[in-house]
Amino acid sequence: MSTKNRDRLVVTEDSDDDNEHEEMSSGDNSGEEGPSYGDAAARDPDETVAFPAPQRKKKKVIKKLTRKEQSLKHSVKEYRIKLAMVKPDITTDREKERNLRRIATKGVVQLFNAVSDRQKTMSDAVKEKMTARDRKEARERFDGKNFDSDKFADSGYGYGGKNEVKGEEEDEQMNIGDDEIDAGNYSDED
């Protein structure tokens, strides 16, 4: 094989433009699609192949914010705080959380008391000696579809008008009593 018919590539180290240092001689490959082992063996062993130096990665430039950008960022943060888009902090709102827990507990107690009273009246009505027709009417009367929420509120389970409006003195007295009760039964570790 002669060197005239083969392609030759010469690359020098630290080359910026690959086209400057490449030498291509076009020749007939005699139908071969790619280089073969014979071509590699026929090369001059003293021939050196140099590769270009790897390009260095650019360091990320940390952009320092201008005063205008800083003030804009601060105003956006304040706006989010105004919109209550901040996670609640239990340590600062401990009193508020305790009041909400107490209200929820009262609501659940009222609900269970109402359910037990309803079950009691229903079982009393069913225990009476009745005809089949009277039992059917009693079941329809105690059906959930016929439940009267006004009657529920009047029976003392719902919130009345006088419970919603409280004086500050009455509220303070209630907080003192709740603290004494809660101290023995509950812990704030949940």
UniProtKB/Swiss-Prot annotation:
Give the superkingdom in one word.
Answer: Eukaryota
Q: What's any GO biological process attached to this entry? A: maturation of LSU-rRNA
Query: Which residue windows does the record flag with biased composition (Basic and acidic residues)?
Result: 1-11, 119-153
Annotated region Disordered: the residues are: 1-69, 119-190
Pull one GO CC term from this UniProt entry.
preribosome, large subunit precursor
In terms of Pfam families, this protein maps to: Rrp15p
Record-linked InterPro entries: Rrp15
- Coiled-coil zones: 59-84
Keywords from the UniProt entry: Coiled coil
Task: State where composition is biased (Basic residues).
Answer: 55-66
Q: Where is the composition biased (Acidic residues)?
A: 167-190
Keyword Metal-binding attributed = no
Similarity annotation: Belongs to the RRP15 family.
- What is the protein name stated in its UniProt record? RRP15-like protein
Species, as recorded = Caenorhabditis briggsae
